[in-house]
Regions:
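Short aromatic/hydrophobic "clamp" motif used to bind/position activated sugar donors
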Residues: 120
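N-terminal membrane-anchoring/stem segments of glycan-assembly enzymes
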Residues: 1-26, 316-319
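Acidic donor-binding segment of Leloir-type glycosyltransferases
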Residues: 51-98
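Long helical/loop segments within the catalytic core of UDP-sugar-dependent glycosyltransferases
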Residues: 86, 91, 96-103, 107, ...
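Cell-envelope/extracellular polymer assembly enzymes that use nucleotide-activated donors
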Residues: 31-34, 63
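Membrane-embedded multi-pass helical conduit in multi-pass membrane proteins
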Residues: 279-354
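Acidic donor-binding/catalytic loop of UDP-sugar-dependent glycosyltransferases
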Residues: 124-140
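Catalytic donor/gating beta->alpha subdomain of glycosyltransferases that bind UDP-sugars
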Residues: 147-172, 201, 206-269
Length: 359
């Protein structure tokens, strides 16, 4: 119970009241920014629906660098033609060769080298901004750090599965957001983060090149430090990721990107696991007390259960408002009960090597 209170009141509880403006400025004004987007398919939905939202951002000086990996000449020509209407778009093509697969890190590396500006933001083609202020808020973060971390939630859909996916995304993002807010950053989010070219080339580019993942966590852990990180938390700076399936798709996605977790520093793994472990032990102790202990212990267990849930619900509501999430708290009790089982399932799946992770 004490560990749970510590996490929700003193760690997660710092997110709603966090103010990046308390950090000293390293730039006197917001810099020009390059937004780098790797594109691994002929995604016309991105071109027609999402790209217009990005180029329409309220920011005076930016470019969008699209790195297309493929062999469709017509699609690439369409990207080039779009530049006539939107001059801030830069399209780069990497010819797809099945004998030499292109990883996301390779595509991002080409995008970084093609970018004209020092300050870089990264996102993916399946996410869209919640407002026309996303870019300006993220770029403003560079005034106080060479690394900018933002949040990306899941698109709201119908059904309980969509609710679980959205809440899982929010609460698991809370781990790295709260750690960054508390002065111990260790990763970003591949849909919404940025850094400078100086940091990238100073680290000799991406690490773990034998993996198809890790650009937002394993590499970031090399360049990240408490003094160079700016965390941008605002509903207007939140991105939304499209959902491509139900729980089976989501668990498969978590298994894929979870392949980087074994390479995290020990303190990060302990930080993540202590909350989950203490929650499981608390539930088990409460169930045992309610089932077999004398009535005095049953009353005490019931009071502690209600007190914990009230605290968790209040903090979850405050966090969801800060991150721009809606309709989270009404069914949070069910997520609180079910998420340990999903975490256990994911842990078992991670014991088996995922061939998609490795090159």
């Amino acid at each position: 119970f004490g560990i749970q209170l510590y996490y929700y009141l003193f760690v997660y509880g710092r997110i709603p009241k966090y103010k990046d403006t308390r950090r000293p400025e390293i730039l006197s004004e917001t810099p020009p920014v390059s937004v780098v987007i790797p594109l691994f398919s002929e995604d016309y939905a991105f071109v027609e629906e999402i790209l217009p939202l990005i180029v329409a951002q309220e920011y005076p000086d930016f470019e969008v660098v699209i790195v297309y990996v493929g062999r469709d000449t017509d699609f690439y020509d369409d990207l080039v033609r779009i530049k006539q209407s939107f001059p801030q778009i830069t399209a780069t093509k990497i010819e797809l060769n099945p004998r030499f697969p292109i990883s996301p890190k390779m595509a991002l590396n080409v995008g970084i080298k093609s970018a004209h500006y020092e300050h870089l933001l990264f996102t993916t083609p399946d996410v869209y901004p919640s407002s026309d202020r996303w870019l300006s808020l993220m770029a403003n973060g560079f005034r106080r750090g060479e690394i900018v971390l933002g949040y990306c939630g899941m698109e709201r859909g119908k059904g309980f599965a969509s609710y679980l996916i959205r809440t899982w995304r929010m609460m698991h993002s809370v781990d790295w957001i709260s750690s960054a807010v508390c002065g111990r950053p260790y990763r970003g989010m591949r849909q919404n983060y940025g850094f400078t070219k100086r940091l990238y080339f100073g680290a000799n580019g991406f690490s773990h090149l034998n993996m198809n993942i890790g650009e937002d966590d394993l590499f970031m852990s090399r360049i990240i430090a408490p003094g160079n990180v700016s965390v941008v938390l605002s509903p207007r700076a939140t991105l939304r990721e499209k959902s491509w399936g139900g729980l089976r798709w989501w668990i498969g996605t978590q298994r894929f990107f979870g392949g980087a977790i074994p390479f995290y520093p020990l303190w990060v793994k302990n930080f993540i696991q202590w909350e989950l472990g203490s929650r499981i032990l608390f539930w088990l102790a409460a169930i045992v007390a309610l089932a077999v202990m004398p009535w005095e212990f049953k009353i005490a267990a019931g009071v502690l259960l209600l007190a914990r849930f009230a605290i968790v619900l209040v903090e979850a509501r405050r966090i969801s408002r800060r991150l721009g999430e809606e309709k989270i708290c009404g069914r949070y009790f069910l997520y609180d009960l079910l998420s340990p089982f999903f975490a256990l399932l994911l842990g078992l799946l991670l014991l088996r090597k995922d061939e998609r992770v490795w090159r």
